[in-house]
Amino acid sequence: MTTHVKPIVLVGPAGVGKTTVGKKLANSLGLSFLDTDALFVKDHGPISEFFAVNGESAFRRLEEDYLSYALSSSGVIATGGGAILSEANRQALKVATVVYLKTDGTHMHKRLSQGTRPLLKN
């Protein structure tokens, strides 16, 4: 008999390590891993470029779709840093075990300075 496991969703600010922790957690538990930002990039290209052309609101609408898709799995899901800003996403997350990750500012600054995060340019 197979037991359905609630998805485990990692939330937290950009650069906290949701993807890194998510991959390790999924591997340890023998579960699948999905990264909603990676799914977005696969379909639409770099998030920073999408932001520049289409704006944050267009990104957030699509982000809701990717989270909804990911929640249909029973694995570990890493969300984008702003995913919980959406009321629709907060409601959707009620079906999951949600884990908030945090770290110190020095660690996050080091991670974020290595990439192109669209909201850091504001």
Segments and roles (model prediction):
Residues 19:
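Walker A/P-loop
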Residues 31:
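Short glycine/serine/threonine/alanine-rich loop segments
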Residues 10:
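Hydrophobic anchor at the beta1->P-loop junction of P-loop NTPases
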Residues 34, 38-92, 118:
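ATP-dependent small-molecule kinase phosphotransfer cores
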